[in-house]
């Protein structure tokens, strides 16, 4: 453990001080809401109800003036705690904007130490800047190349910390500004009170997303800490440089971690790590779900499982049972990952071999990584969004009844095209055609409800080609790009898979089943 602690001290030498005064600078809040920051790895779209851009700038200046008062935050908390329910509601409506923009500005500030670590790296210019690394679909070509040669897989759900206070010591390694950490504890305390209040009052549930960007940053920091030790142990377990093809949004921080890894040459430490030495161990993650696959024996996977459980217990101080991390052989197991049901299939082939006058057949087996659309969970997501019933029967969307016909068709078409674009890597398209059918008929019934007619009468009057023009736009483009190898008819089946390298986030309907 002493060698490991020495490693962390060297790797975390770049720590920043005095971040708290940045909250009094207007440019921080400009960065938080600037359109140019939408490419940030922590960006989340934000809406303010009842405020335009000009009034927002005025309120930001007023907020900075109030923050110069020493007890501004203390008075806000006491005001909301003493007045009970009425105090809570008044607090949410009067201080919602102030609290929200402070948390957004604070999120930008605490990201600064992580960004400076990447900029200060001497090898930063050597890091490839390919935009394809941002695509979520770039994980699947990696799985296609690797999983067909592996034997065991473990489907892992990274547990959430029992208390958010556990996340503060993680940031203490990177940030030594004590006032900033106290402000972080203030937001965590406020969030805890907000959760207990919202459970009994659904009318103001929208405010539960007030600090979404901040808590995504904290969660990414927590998961990054898990991967920090995982990468460290992986680098110690082999003498050759490992090739990392994993893609995730916080890739810049991942590169920073990779470049700051220091080899600890100690005989006793190497003896401790010998059970984890496996050159065929692969790890991918998206959000809180990870996959650990290995070519080694089942015993090696069990050692990794108990290591992770003990690591979570002693380092993050919460309990996790080993039996919740299942280890399965790849040939008999299917797992959900990023909206796909993935598995490794065995394809037998008979090859005819002829030598001189003798000929004989050779039976050959090929392993193939296969991905299909999980139709039942996806229909469940459509049912929650009120596009169909639980059994998949299309229904109208009365909430959109006040929109124009073009807007209704455009919204349904956009959802359908996004799903088609995301699930273009499926080997079986029949499930995707069923989803398209549900959305088409739901769109027709929404238009019929608006015009007080029936879906059949509406389609007979306008023609079915009106809807097909919107829903088949992407298929026509792809058939133009791949005219010979990959036909894209409206109905039919083809097994060609296309992974799109421009998808940086999961569709909302797909995100519910991940």
From Swiss-Prot:
It is found in: Plastid, Chloroplast. InterPro entries: Domain_X, Maturase_MatK, Maturase_MatK_N. The keyword Mitochondrion does not apply. One of its GO terms (cellular component) is chloroplast. GO terms for biological process: mRNA processing; RNA splicing; tRNA processing. Disulfide bonds: none annotated. One of its GO terms (molecular function) is RNA binding. Belongs to the intron maturase 2 family. MatK subfamily. Usually encoded in the trnK tRNA gene intron. Probably assists in splicing its own and other chloroplast group II introns. This is Maturase K.
